[in-house]
């Protein structure tokens, strides 16, 4: 069944099914579908990211992230572990810490679209711990997160002229690296994953990248905020927020704002 449909208030029919196809892929992906070399690479990225986060755990950036998360958590306690700190919190608050410290040293992966590991790995790990999932389910969520994130991120890359004048959104499309692993672990069906992607489009930040001008450490916290928001969005959809589907197919929504008409919009 096609999800996209005529929006009666403005007579607009979503012209493509990109969001639906990505959502169905994420729902249907199983561990058995993943080639052995991809499983091995996912494990390597997992270990690399945890190692980078542990190396950053005593930095001022980590200290401030823990204080913020602990305050939001109402003190210590919860089902999710903050790596290397002997502390547990609600997964959504632990995600703020782990997303931040995974990027704090810039030692995690480096895709040409950004640093997806700082979202995919903490979010997949914390959701799996929260829901008591297996190692195979963890790896599957990691792969689903990478596959969907990278396709969206590649499709919305702006032209050189646009990003030089309007900014580059590496912490904007990062939201999809955070939503998809949680949605997969939570067992959301394709329709709900579609909703979650739509909420990610609405909650995404502007492609400003001002930190690159000022060299602010806020850049690292942005990865933590995206990880936290990934959990909040998945939980919101799980609770029943609706009518947010097909957002990647509406050119006046996310893709038009991020890359306009001069990027690779939709081609990846």
For the regions a protein language model found, what residue spans apply to each?
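N-terminal core-entry segment
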Residues: 2-267
């Amino acid at each position: 069944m096609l999800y996209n449909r005529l929006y009666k208030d403005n007579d607009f029919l979503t012209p493509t099914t990109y969001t639906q196809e990505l959502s169905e892929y994420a729902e249907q992906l199983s561990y058995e579908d993943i080639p052995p070399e991809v499983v091995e690479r996912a494990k390597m990225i997992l270990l690399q990211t945890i190692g980078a986060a542990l190396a950053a755990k005593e930095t001022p950036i980590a200290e401030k992230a823990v204080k913020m998360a602990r305050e939001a958590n109402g003190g210590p306690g919860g089902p999710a572990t903050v790596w290397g700190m002997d502390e547990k919190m609600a997964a959504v608050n632990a995600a703020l810490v782990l997303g931040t410290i995974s990027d704090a040293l810039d030692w995690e992966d480096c895709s040409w679209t950004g640093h997806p590991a700082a979202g995919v790995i903490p979010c997949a790990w914390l959701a799996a711990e929260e829901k008591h999932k297996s190692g195979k389910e963890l790896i599957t969520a990691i792969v689903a997160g990478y596959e969907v994130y990278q396709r969206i991120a590649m499709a919305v890359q702006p032209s050189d002229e646009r990003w030089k004048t309007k900014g580059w959104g590496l912490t904007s499309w990062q939201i999809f690296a955070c939503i998809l692993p949680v949605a997969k672990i939570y067992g959301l069906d394709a329709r709900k994953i579609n909703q979650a992607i739509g909420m990610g489009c609405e909650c995404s930040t502007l492609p400003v990248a001002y930190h690159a001008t000022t060299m602010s450490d806020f850049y690292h916290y942005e990865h933590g905020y995206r990880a936290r928001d990934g959990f909040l969005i998945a939980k919101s959809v799980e609770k029943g927020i609706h009518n947010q589907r097909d957002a990647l197919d509406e050119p006046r929504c996310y893709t038009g704002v991020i890359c306009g008409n001069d990027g690779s919009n939709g081609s990846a």
